[in-house]
Curated annotation (Swiss-Prot):
The gene is lysX. Its cofactor is Mg(2+). Mg(2+) 1 binds at residues 1018, 1025. The keyword Membrane applies. This is Lysylphosphatidylglycerol biosynthesis bifunctional protein LysX. The lineage of its organism: Bacteria, Bacillati, Actinomycetota, Actinomycetes, Mycobacteriales. It comes from Mycolicibacterium smegmatis (strain ATCC 700084 / mc(2)155). In the N-terminal section; belongs to the LPG synthetase family. In the C-terminal section; belongs to the class-II aminoacyl-tRNA synthetase family. InterPro entries: Aa-tRNA-synt_II, aa-tRNA-synth_II, aa-tRNA-synth_II/BPL/LPL, LPG_synthase_C, Lys-tRNA-ligase_II, Lys-tRNA-ligase_II_N, Lys-tRNA-synth_II_C, NA-bd_OB-fold. Catalyzes the production of L-lysyl-tRNA(Lys)transfer and the transfer of a lysyl group from L-lysyl-tRNA(Lys) to membrane-bound phosphatidylglycerol (PG), which produces lysylphosphatidylglycerol (LPG), one of the components of the bacterial membrane with a positive net charge. LPG synthesis contributes to the resistance to cationic antimicrobial peptides (CAMPs) and likely protects M.tuberculosis against the CAMPs produced by competiting microorganisms (bacteriocins). Keywords: Aminoacyl-tRNA synthetase, Antibiotic resistance, ATP-binding, Cell membrane, Ligase, Lipid metabolism, Magnesium, Membrane, Metal-binding, Multifunctional enzyme, Nucleotide-binding, Transferase, Transmembrane, Transmembrane helix. One of its GO terms (biological process) is lipid metabolic process. Residues 604-1106 are annotated as: Lysine--tRNA ligase.
Amino acid sequence: MTVISRVEHLPARPASRVAWVPAAAGWTVGVIATLSLIASVSPLVRSLIRVPREFVNDFIFNFPDTSFAWAFVLALLAAALAARKRIAWWVLVLYLVGAIGWNVGDLAAGGDTVADDIGELIGIAFHVAAIVFLVVARKEFWAKVRRGALLKSAAVLVAGNLIGIVVAWGLLQAFPGTLDPEWRLPYAVNRVSGFATVPTEVFEGYSHTFLNAIFGLFGALALMAAAIVLFQSQRASNALTGEDESAIRGLLELYGKNDSLGYFATRRDKSVVFAPNGRAAITYRVEVGVCLASGDPVGDPKSWPQAIAAWLQLCQAYGWAPGVMGASLAGAEAYRAAGLNALQLGDEAILHPDRFRLSGPDMRAVRQAVTRARRAGTSVRIRRHRELSPEEMAAVIRRADAWRDTETERGFSMALGRLGDPADDDCLLVEAVQGDEVVAMLSLVPWGSNGVSLDVMRRSPRSPNGTIELMVSELCMQAEDIGISRISLNFAMFRSAFEQGAQLGAGPVARLWRALLVFFSKWWQLESLYRSNMKYQPEWVPRYACYEDARLVPRVGVASVIAEGFLVLPFSRRNKQHTGEHIAAPDTLVQSGRLHRDGSAPDVTGLQGELPDADDEPRLPEQVRVRMAKLKALQGNGVDAYPVGQPPSHTVAQALGATDGETLSVAGRVMRIRDYGGVLFAQLRDWSGEVQLLLDNAALTEGETADFTATIDLGDLVEVTGSMGFSRNGTRSLLVERWRLIGKCLRPLPDKWKGLTDQEARVRARYVDLAVNTEARDLIRARSGALHAIRETLYSKGFLEVETPILQQIHGGANARPFLTHINAYDLDLYLRIAPELYLKRLCVGGVERVFELGRAFRNEGVDFSHNPEFTLLEAYQAHADYNVWIDGCRELIQNAAQAANGAQVFLRPRPNDPAGTLEPVDISGQWAVKTVHDAVSEAIGEHITPETELGELRRLCDSAGIPYLTHWDAGAVVLEMYEHLVEDRTTEPTFYKDFPTSVSPLTRPHRSIPGVAERWDLVAWGVELGTAYSELTDPVEQRRRLQEQSLLAAGGDPEAMELDEDFLQAMEYAMPPTGGLGMGVDRVVMMITGRSIRETLPFPLAKPR
């Protein structure tokens, strides 16, 4: 038997000079078949072509005047020749050889006229030439034919012909024409089953012309019935076997979480072809010479190319045109990579229950429909198929059949076609119930482990309006309880055409295309499917059809219509049970015994072990593979490479200070190994330090040094027990008595001397950097010490530490672009906070007089050496104080942090004119300089400015200094721009700049004595702003006015402007005491203390995706 799903890798066929022969032969025979068919039904055509037809019929090719049967045979032969079928080549060659013999026999017999002799010679020449071309091009006819039930098909053909002959004979008895009685039966045989090959002149008399057409039709019907039986048997015998379905179910469990249509691959009237490694498969059906694949390949995406290649080789081997229905974007890209073209068919409607809400204007239609159904007393019941008794499932099937609005079940790529099968007990049944009567139902197949995909939708004609909407809504509402997070509804074909054609201003082509689709929707429900899905506001996911050549699109379309059940062929049936006779699953899986003959899913763990690795799976580095092999060997010997933890008695630092001879244990990472045979030295590092291990066979109580070298690699975590002592050269060492592996390192550490030299690698692999780089550990310690010192300083002054919301409904407290997120529980957009200020001030209103928060803030802005989107911010507020109080307070916080991190009140700064960037300490003790903003700008620009300086004068100074500004800025904004360019960027040692313009300080109190400025200062050091403080604005009326101005800016498109926070303003109206507030960027302070960039001081700064 031919097993069509196991295909050898066929090489690409080289271009040939005679590649045109199959198409030419097919076209030639097809023209004769077409003319024969037309002549059989049209006396006019029969009369017009009589002379050439008789010449062709007598000398070249059988071409009777009327024969539906012969036209059908020639049509099959033409299609087979064009499809490069080897059997068609044999049939045509043998026919031509027979025709040569016929003509040669006539010539040898003699007695013909000269015209007949010439015709026979022309016929012989034509036949010889045709045979030569066919023989030369024989390799172009490579396509095989699937085995089928030949005997059954032949029996149908014989029975059909016998019936046709008997009926034809009876008609001739009734309407004999001029035929003699003894010639009537042979005449019927010739016309029904002999394709009218015997010339009419042989018979004594003639029959009526219309009877000739009827007799040919009898023969054609017999041939059609035989062909249908043959094709059905081919499909049935090559459909899924139980083992194939079992393998597909296993692949779905391993890899099917992303394909909503994956479960439909188990449909049993499909065939399947597997990738050679068995990790992927494609299910398909053959219709009208098109091998139609169903959706994406099933299985490991890495093996999709191999599965597609095997499928295309299958198409080539049998001369089928490849086509795909319902591929996803990923699947279409995989097919396109294999040489196919893709065309978007439409979109699949996906619902996400966590986002589904009946509220809102967009859901009004659904909400009203659900309300109507509920008022009619309809409730919803949701169960898995396995929860139904056999009697209940039988009732479900009866209702589904009774409510179906078509004679047959439709579907191919997006339907299962076997409701109630025991193998599908994980399917979900949703029923609408009125009283005790079920009035509608949905059946959904599994989509991975947490999704469902719609298979069957039925409703009773007596169901109330809104029943379907109620079932879908209840399914979404109860999804969390039944473990569902995604639902695939119907597929809307040509959705974009409906949507675009209905838009205002749509072009004439779009409107015409939509009108055509609306017209055809009367039969095929195109528009109704789109509208029934659209009202749920789904996510639309495109689905594609794939084809090899644009000329094949109509054939692929017809094959799809047939496969989906929109065009039902005579005697067609859809198999619900296994009919396949040839197992397509790889032999290794079949022989493993893990596949089940009933089609149920195999043991996934065992199946995964039987599947070889994907051919294109990237190979691990050699050192990793060696270490993995060592780990496997250790586990095979019963060694637990990752045991439960036991605290060592000492850290490395404590061990180094312990007395000699004292038994102790330490744990850490092995950084170096030096093996001298019987004595071995290793460097062990923990967080506190590094110690040398000395392993001597004479001192070890368990095992030998060779065991250590065989087991331990650099980077492994070990625990050792022994006592402190000295090596022969006097190095302080831990004399090891026993050891154990507590963590196998599967990847090698970087260079033991240089460590990670690439800065990007240090960011991405901070854990490795910390393991090998003491400098990285020092930075972590410095940061921790600085944070601790800041907290302790504030605690010592009586401040309370609090935590305020990070998720906020309104972004405020600073001018910055926020991050936006969404909370599904309330269907509400939220911001990650840009500052905790507004919540801390609420606490001040409530009477918390000294409060601070040290936490994370988020700003969707640039990233550079001093900026990170996620950063640590200190905000502190002290009642009955002003901004001057915080000059000393901020300085003390930073000096204490520097003391804790560096052991002295110093910043580390790069040494001037040093290319190596060597850091040197800069003293920051004592008082720091304090200047007003306007004085500092005046010093920098060389002209005196004050808060009263006119805007025009400020613009003139900007122009002369080359400082850009925007025309809508006021004087305060221009002064701020001058300050940032001329003062802030050029500042070195820590300096407080105070009294900023009021217009750029919306939350700050106006200066008590100087109009136009606010009581605010910024602390700047070496061009970096470290902190800012305010005399807070406590006047609620003025505060409202300023925030309203900010909200207008936000409404005008300024992404950094603050929104109006009505709750905050109402809190302020309860009166907040005079307060001084401080904001300090802790990351930047640590950056200055350590002399590093902000990314280096953060344990895990944000890094771009690889």
